[in-house]
């Protein structure tokens, strides 16, 4: 009987020790690689064609960049519950379509149909410093709340064979600052590799998901 209680006691201590382990602790490095959805510009602004009033027979409309954004995050645990790091993400949005317009021919003195193509791209890069507070931790789960702030750059370009438009590009964001508030969870499949999901406002997509590694 004494041996049975001894075995039960050792088992209880072992389980308690396992549950007390945390997936991250002071001194750990954490790397996240993620995709984000939605790409707000493509989902809302460019999802439906809005051609110029002079453009008729719009066709072959497609989005540039798709509906996802992509990014990476690096974090260093300065304490068991606090981490500091950098969050960088990138997205491309825009549209491409063919259209027909009527132009006056000075030789024939008649209006004639002309076919053109227009291609618009907006490339957005954000680089933000970040602070995370890890409020739930066990042997496999790491839940956190985060705040990030930093720099945003936007590059816009228009390419067309329509002589009534000028090809060109515009560099710089109207407000070159980006902020993000988020809550997220990492679930570790092994001691070092897991998956992550984050819900946030500003500074990227509403929902981010991907892989996480800690060292």
Specify the residue positions occupied by each region the protein language model found.
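Solvent-exposed loop/turn segments connecting transmembrane beta-strands
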Residues: 139, 196-210
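Glycine-rich phosphate-binding "P-loop"
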Residues: 148-179
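Short glycine/proline- and aromatic-enriched beta-strand/turn motifs that initiate or cap beta-hairpins
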Residues: 20-76, 144, 206, 210-214
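Gram-negative (and chloroplast) outer-membrane scaffold detector with strong preference
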Residues: 30, 35-39, 68-160, 187-189, ...
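Short sequence motifs at beta-strands and strand-loop junctions characteristic
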Residues: 60-68, 119-126, 171-178, 189, ...
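Solvent-exposed, glycine/polar-rich loop segments of beta-barrel outer-membrane systems
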Residues: 45-57, 105-110, 160-170
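Extracellular loop and loop/strand-boundary signature of outer-membrane beta-barrel proteins
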Residues: 55-60, 112-119, 166-171, 194-196
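Cleavable N-terminal export/targeting peptides
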Residues: 1-28
């Amino acid at each position: 009987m004494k041996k049975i209680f001894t075995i039960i006691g050792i088992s209880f201590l072992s389980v308690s020790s396992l549950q007390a382990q945390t997936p991250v602790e002071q001194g750990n490095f954490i790397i996240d690689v993620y995709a984000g959805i939605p790409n707000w510009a493509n989902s809302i602004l460019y999802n439906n064609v809005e051609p110029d009033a002079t453009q008729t027979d719009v066709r072959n409309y497609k989005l540039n960049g798709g509906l996802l954004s992509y990014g990476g995050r690096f974090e260093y645990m300065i304490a068991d519950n606090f981490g500091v790091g950098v969050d960088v993400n990138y997205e491309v949005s825009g549209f491409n379509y063919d259209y027909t317009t009527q132009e006056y021919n000075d030789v024939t003195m008649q209006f004639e149909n002309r076919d053109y193509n227009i291609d618009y791209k907006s490339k957005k890069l954000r680089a933000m410093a970040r602070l995370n507070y890890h409020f739930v931790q066990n042997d496999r789960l790491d839940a956190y709340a985060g705040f990030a702030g930093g720099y945003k750059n936007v590059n816009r370009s228009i390419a067309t064979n329509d002589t009534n438009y000028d090809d060109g590009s515009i560099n710089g964001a109207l407000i070159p600052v980006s902020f993000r508030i988020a809550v997220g969870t990492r679930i570790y499949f092994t001691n070092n590799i897991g998956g992550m999901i984050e819900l946030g406002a500003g500074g990227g997509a509403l929902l981010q998901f991907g892989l996480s590694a800690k060292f």
